[in-house]
């Protein structure tokens, strides 16, 4: 499919890109996974809503938070079930043995049901298929046209500080108030702050209550810091 080819081209461009461009390419890949692709496996349709990029290239992108599993190398378009940590499922996009690249499916819709990182593998395995069955599947990326509003932020609960400030998460902003994204609230604070400052600039006479209502409308919750942001 053309959209898988687009992903492949971006991945191929990643290796020789400068650092800032690498981050941009990883964001573009995440954006395309959310808006342009769905994953079809054994009758389960997975629609990504929040994905996090994990890339390891020893000389050009040494992200120690990447598991560096062999299943994150040269397995473009195949699933990787985590072998350690909290548990989870990634879609591998590496097309070479030279580097690891996969995207954690942190929040998804699976056959229309909202699932978090640890819920997704349980849901998949409840089909009666094994991890190996899922990981052996190929050609699981299919075209989608989701048209979400995509934003970026940092990754959640990193074990190591490297690339912790890099905006390597892509997420569907319009999904945030609809589903339970409490796991992401710490990482979303800066997004909320930036949105609120822009809102106040466009509505200079808005009250604190109006700002709180707007935050809730867009993000589904109101950080405690809203009062500080409004009155400073």
Model features per residue range: what roles?
Residues 188-232:
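Basic, alpha-helical nucleic-acid-binding regions used in initiation and control of genome expression
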Residues 1-190:
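A cross-family signal for N-terminal binding/gating loops and helix N-caps
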């Amino acid at each position: 499919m053309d959209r898988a080819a687009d992903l492949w081209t971006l991945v191929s461009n990643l290796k020789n890109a400068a650092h800032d461009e690498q981050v941009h390419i990883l964001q573009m890949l995440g954006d395309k996974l959310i808006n342009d692709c769905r994953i079809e496996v054994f009758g389960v349709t997975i629609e990504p809503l929040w994905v996090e990029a994990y890339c390891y290239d020893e000389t050009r992108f040494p992200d120690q938070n990447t598991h560096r599993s062999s299943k994150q190398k040269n397995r473009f378009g195949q699933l990787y079930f985590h072998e350690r940590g909290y548990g989870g499922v990634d879609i591998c996009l590496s097309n070479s043995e030279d580097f690891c690249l996969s995207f954690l499916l942190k929040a998804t819709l699976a056959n229309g049901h909202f699932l978090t990182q640890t819920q997704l593998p349980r849901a998949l395995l409840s089909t009666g298929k094994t991890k190996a069955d899922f990981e052996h599947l190929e050609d699981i990326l299919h075209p989608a046209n989701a048209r979400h509003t995509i934003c970026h932020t940092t990754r959640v609960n990193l074990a190591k500080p490297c690339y912790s400030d890099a905006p390597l998460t892509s997420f569907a902003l319009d999904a945030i108030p609809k589903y339970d994204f409490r796991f992401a609230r710490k990482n979303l604070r800066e997004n909320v702050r930036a949105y609120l400052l822009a809102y106040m600039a466009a509505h200079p006479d808005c009250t604190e209550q109006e700002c709180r209502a707007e935050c809730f409308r867009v993000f589904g919750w109101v950080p405690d810091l809203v009062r500080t942001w409004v009155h400073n």
